[in-house]
């Protein structure tokens, strides 16, 4: 199976890596084009474009200027160990055992505003470029127009005709995939908490749960919807009444 995750704004380039394996992103030419455009933006421009503080504008200006090819293990880091948000705390990639790294690599794909789509061990350098950023790139009015064809083609080339495809990304990122031309149906998973007498999606918990579901899929080498329905990490369980077809709901 394949599953897609969103990236994280929070990055970790300090923790010692559990593996020396790394690969190269398939869309580095496109990434380089975007970086050349970002290099022309001042810190103040970036703050306005991304609706971030002056300090973050300066940080990302510095990141853009420092970004350069070729990527090596000394100036870049495998994506799954570089992202550090709630999803990645749920995934906890640092504790995935060596004998499961191939399953991780074959299963997880990370959508990215700068890199398009990443395999877990694809090298990345620090950046910030959310998919929803209103950045005009040549004739493309935004990053969705810039990336949609390449991302969808890249996924289709990898997907088997009957392979399970699970969306664990946010709407902002999943919109970068053209589901009309994707060669397999999309399975979705939502995670709800019982609060004030009803079940609802709470963003912080839902993000962590997406990461935990990705970890579960790797741990169990999930291949079918029934495999996914067994997800029981951190108190979650599958809700048959709330689920419908390929839209799975897990509650706790």
Language-model features: locations:
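Pocket-edge structural micro-motifs
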Residues: 5-7, 240, 252
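Internal, well-folded beta-alpha domain core
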Residues: 93-243, 249
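Active-site helix-to-loop segments that bind/position phosphate- or nucleotide-bearing substrates
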Residues: 4-95
